[in-house]
Amino acid sequence: VQAETKEADIVSARIAMLLGERTFQFSPVELLTIHRRLFEGVFEHAGRIRPYNISKREWVLKGDSVIYAACDSIKDTLEYDFYTEKQFSYEGLSLQESVKHLAKFTSDIWQIHPFCEGNTRTTAVFVIKYMKTFGLEVSNDVFAEHSWYFRNALVRANYNNLKNGIHATTEYLELFFSNLLLNTNYELKNR
């Protein structure tokens, strides 16, 4: 437990440092660089794309797993999602419509799960820095206070089980981003 606490403290300090920097490049390379800078010395694979396929038993899915990108398609999938987002215009969208789109982009990037560990924290830092490029005031506080909800919202945004009537939805992620960006006060519950 002590090693986990030390890791969390190191990474938390690095998150604060990265978010304090006024630098950003919208690219897959930036995502990899953020991961490396967050986890260097913590994970030996910091900043490197995972070389194997994964599944993770999720509490919120009663032990089922999201289907993540195959390891041999991560680079191409990231490039596709970034290209698609670069082509998207936020011009003429309300802030609420922008929140909905940002939630979808965030869930798409997270679903790729390019790293062995640290995907949610890396995605959070990347998305905060990306949102700031739109002039949005974003802090890590809502992410830190509701990190488990954020992760579960990402899981639900990427999970389908038609047999049980479950469809992927960004609804919960939109509530999270609405609290973050629109000063709403939705109750963020994991159940």
Give, region by region, the residue ranges found by the protein language model.
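FIC/Doc superfamily catalytic core
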Residues: 1-191
